[in-house]
């Protein structure tokens, strides 16, 4: 990485802090306002300079299309609460990055998902655990998957037959989720490949 000027470092720090506090990068207008630039165009020029130096990536066509490359390379992205209808790996869902070797899991983990609820506790996936996920749609019946039904994301064991998908919990207190593929949007976000235990259970 090339050294940043003082002003570029200010812009970079603002982006990083804004993501940490709000879960999403700032707009050009917000950068201009916070740092006293005359216009969003001035902020854009600084963003382009940061992109040339390899510390951010500018995603075209989005007002908040800024991605911190340094942090992406520094561990697996940790996905927290997922907003309805938005991509799982959208920047605003990334709580941070976790220092773990993706190669510890087979196949390799692409991201971590913070587990909410106890529907899979009988196979050791507890509330608050970090689920290691391999991003793929190539899954088989009987595997534990991260699935999206319409706007909701869930972790369950997959059973598919014809136009019907059953998402099976591993806890007798929960009922299977039955999905009619003719009536609902359904997709697989990834395959569960491991768990990092929440220390509160130890």
UniProtKB/Swiss-Prot annotation:
GO MF assignments: DNA binding; serine-type endopeptidase activity
Domain of life: Bacteria
Catalytic function, reaction form: Hydrolysis of Ala-|-Gly bond in repressor LexA
Site (Cleavage): 84-85
Biological process, per Gene Ontology: DNA repair; DNA replication; negative regulation of DNA-templated transcription; proteolysis; SOS response
Entry-linked InterPro entries: LexA, LexA-like, LexA/Signal_pep-like_sf, LexA_DNA-bd_dom, LexA_repressor, Peptidase_S24_LexA, Peptidase_S24_S26A/B/C, WH-like_DNA-bd_sf
DNA-binding region as annotated in the record: 28-48
Enzyme category, top tier: hydrolase
Keywords annotated in UniProt: Autocatalytic cleavage, DNA damage, DNA repair, DNA replication, DNA-binding, Hydrolase, Repressor, SOS response, Transcription, Transcription regulation
Active-site annotation: 119, 156
HAMAP family: LexA
Main function: Represses a number of genes involved in the response to DNA damage (SOS response), including recA and lexA. Binds to the 16 bp palindromic sequence 5'-CTGTATATATATACAG-3'. In the presence of single-stranded DNA, RecA interacts with LexA causing an autocatalytic cleavage which disrupts the DNA-binding part of LexA, leading to derepression of the SOS regulon and eventually DNA repair.
Quaternary structure (record): Homodimer.
Protein name: LexA repressor
Species name: Cronobacter sakazakii (strain ATCC BAA-894) (Enterobacter sakazakii)
């Amino acid at each position: 990485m090339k050294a940043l000027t003082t002003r570029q470092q200010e812009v970079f720090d603002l982006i990083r802090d804004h993501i940490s506090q709000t879960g999403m990068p700032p707009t050009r207008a917000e950068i201009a306002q916070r740092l006293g630039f005359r216009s969003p165009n001035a902020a854009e020029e600084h963003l382009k300079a940061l992109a040339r130096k390899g510390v951010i990536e500018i995603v075209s066509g989005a007002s908040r299309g800024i991605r911190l490359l340094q942090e992406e390379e520094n561990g697996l992205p940790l996905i927290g609460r997922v907003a309805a209808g938005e991509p799982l790996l959208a920047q605003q869902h990334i709580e941070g990055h976790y220092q773990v070797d993706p190669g510890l899991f087979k196949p390799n983990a692409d991201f971590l998902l913070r587990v909410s609820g106890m529907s899979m506790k009988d196979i050791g996936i507890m509330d608050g655990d970090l689920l290691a996920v391999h991003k793929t749609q190539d899954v088989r019946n009987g595997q534990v998957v991260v699935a999206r039904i319409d706007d909701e994301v869930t972790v369950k064991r997959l059973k598919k037959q014809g136009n019907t998908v059953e998402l099976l919990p591993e806890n007798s207190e929960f009922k299977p989720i039955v999905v009619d593929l003719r009536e609902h949007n359904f997709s697989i976000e990834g395959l569960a490949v491991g768990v990092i235990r929440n220390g509160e259970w130890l």
